[in-house]
A protein has these predicted regions:
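Exposed, low-structure sequence patches enriched in small/polar residues
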Residues: 1-164
């Protein structure tokens, strides 16, 4: 990172270059079927500490134009000055109206920051390689089973490939 940043209340990661090694094992279940999933575990470097991660994902396609998935990951991070445990859960929905028009949704919870994020993207590929995006984001503080809105953002984006 170019600037120092805080990842725990008392732990700041200094600016600088970091190299990580990571070892991962995983298994995928029926990735082209109506119901699929994945289990994985990994261990490796994380800035100047190390991280264990265990994750699971389940995906369901009730019909070809709708995909629903749930993800969970547990991260245990150890640093010389402390440890952190984070639980991250997410739910996704992908609606394919046509081959050129997609609406994607993501809801994610992070126990370390006690936040819930919502992201909705409407994507229109009006020409091969050229897309318009309408993006809606909200971030909530999740404390004591109550959600408090912290931020709302609406973005319009355009992307295009120019050939010459």
């Amino acid at each position: 990172p170019d600037n120092d940043f805080t990842i725990l209340r008392d732990l700041t990661i200094p600016a600088g270059d970091y190299w990580w090694n990571q070892y991962r094992i995983g298994i995928d279940f029926a990735s082209r079927r109506k119901v699929s999933g994945e289990l994985s575990a990994s261990y490796g470097d994380f800035y100047f500490g190390d991280r264990w991660r265990v994750g699971a994902e389940a995906t369901y396609y009730p019909w070809k134009r709708l995909g629903l998935s749930l993800d969970y990951a547990y991260n245990h991070v150890s640093f010389p000055l402390g440890v952190a445990d984070a639980h991250i859960g997410a739910g996704r929905a992908l609606i394919n109206f046509t081959t050129n028009l997609v609406w994607a949704h993501l809801v994610q919870y992070d126990s370390l920051s006690e936040s819930v994020g919502y992201n909705s993207r409407l994507i229109w590929e009006y020409r091969p390689g050229s897309k318009l995006f309408a993006v809606f984001n909200q971030n909530y503080l999740a404390e004591n089973l109550t959600l408090t809105l912290r931020q709302t953002e609406v973005t319009l984006k355009a992307g295009a490939i120019f050939r010459f």
